[in-house]
Amino acid sequence: LSTADEWSKQSAIDYYAQHRHEVSDLYPSEKVFLPRVLFPGIKVLDVGCASGGFFNIMRTYEPAIEYTGIDLSVKAVGMARERYPEAKFIVTEGFGLPFEDNTFDLVHCTSVFNNEPNYQAMLQEMYRVSSRFVLVDIRLLKNIGKQQNSIYNIQFEGGRVEATVPYVVNDADEVANFILGLKPKPKALRATGYFHQMAKEAEHADFEVCMTVLLVQKGDAGSGATVIDLGNLPIEFSVSGD
């Protein structure tokens, strides 16, 4: 189910035009892995790029990047192209990514999985087109079993509710086990994050979830056990990299 119309509402377009373009706009968890995985000449795919803010953030850390941003909103991509003509932006919908295997060194995706129930299909495609790293954020809880879905209001800056999309919280072990089952086997799975109240636009904004950033390092056919480093999360996992 496409949410292109919902994310093209004016309050969403205006919000991402004004926010999330500078390193100072990043959440603490977003500052941990991103500067460590960027290097001169890196080829980056940014999934859910909105108006292109992460291009500016990434080039602040590393000026020599080759950046491609994709988003389902025609309006957002139009703004990104106008603001950052030196980068590449594409409108695309659905779970299939229009790129060959191992095209990008880094596939980055933030503020998407918390509104997408089928994170598995997206993550599998991102892993496929990456040759080295996949960096994503996701909302997690321990021992909830099945995925929890509620409502997220497209209502930025205190205006009226223009539309609604899902707000998704996933089971921590289920997500980790899905990642560990990717082919080829990941070399490493690392994470950082903290408990925080849901976004104020969410239906249960007073409820705390683990705001999690996951860094998956892609393996190859000869990869052995996956290195698992989840110690920076306030959640205990019951998973094995064997």
Task: Indicate residue ranges for each PLM-predicted region.
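Short conserved loop adjoining the S-adenosyl-L-methionine
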Residues: 96-101
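Conserved class I S-adenosyl-L-methionine
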Residues: 1-38, 41-50, 135-160
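A conserved beta-strand element that flanks and buttresses the S-adenosyl-L-methionine
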Residues: 108
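Short alpha-helix
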Residues: 164-191
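Class I SAM-dependent methyltransferase SAM/SAH-binding core
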Residues: 51-95
